[in-house]
């Protein structure tokens, strides 16, 4: 599960009802603003279609204004499409110069052992994230300040699960259909790995036959 709290700018409401993830939603095109349109994080907001205060606030939200949204980010296989944000709360009464972009990526894993050196004291590594109970995987980068390099070197193992706190970043080159996508991490955590046994793998019990394989019977 990937949690987000962000100030989001509404571009336009989507007129048609959206059926996604087994539920009916009302939707909107939106973005986490940036100084450049090439650097904004594009989103498709999905608000559960049920009468109530949240739905009213969502439908009354004015185009071109910002609201503080919390919810869950869903990454899909098609990286050319905006990220889906399933809205849990919305607060439209905020200062219009307010900025927030905080994400906790809870179902990520290391997609590589290779740590890349970037400009301005930044390092990066490829990570993957999956949909809940699914084989669908999206690839992106985790960017870190170089002061985290020792920790990353100690923890990295391809396929190892990782939980990340940071903010989302996208960049689109002119003509590209898919953006460069990263989570810029404040920090990350991993589960402690068990010590690998140096034993010979043989059973330690007293019964005999664990290391022997009999011929296959013809039943």
What feature does the model see in each segment?
Residues 66-96:
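Short, structured interface segments
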Residues 9-10, 73, 109-110, 168:
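Hydrophobic beta-strand positions in extracellular immunoglobulin-like domains
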Residues 1-4, 14-24, 31-42, 53-59, ...:
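Acidic, gly/ser/pro-rich intrinsically disordered tails
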Residues 64-78, 160-173:
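Flexible glycine-rich surface loops and low-complexity tracts that mediate binding to linear polymers
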């Amino acid at each position: 599960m990937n949690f987000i709290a962000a100030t989001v700018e509404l571009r336009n409401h989507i007129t048609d009802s959206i059926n996604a993830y087994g539920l009916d939603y009302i939707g909107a095109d939106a973005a986490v603003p940036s100084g450049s349109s090439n650097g904004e994080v594009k989103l498709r907001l999905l608000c559960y279609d049920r009468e109530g205060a949240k739905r009213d606030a969502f439908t009354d939200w004015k185009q071109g204004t910002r609201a503080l949204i919390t919810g869950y980010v869903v990454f899909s296989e098609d990286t050319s499409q905006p990220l889906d944000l399933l809205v849990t709360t919305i607060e439209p009464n905020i200062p219009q110069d307010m900025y927030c972009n905080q994400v906790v990526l809870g179902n990520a894993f290391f997609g590589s052992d290779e740590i890349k050196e970037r400009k301005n004291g930044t390092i990066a590594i490829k990570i993957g994230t999956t949909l809940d109970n699914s084989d669908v995987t999206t690839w992106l980068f985790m960017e870190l300040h170089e002061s985290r390099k020792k920790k990353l070197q100690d923890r990295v193992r391809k396929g190892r699960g990782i939980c990340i706190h940071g903010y989302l970043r996208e960049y689109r080159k002119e003509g590209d259909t898919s953006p460069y996508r990263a989570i810029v991490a404040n920090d990350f955590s991993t589960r402690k790995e068990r010590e690998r046994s140096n034993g010979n793998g043989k059973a330690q019990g007293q019964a005999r036959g664990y290391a022997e394989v009999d011929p296959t019977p013809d039943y």
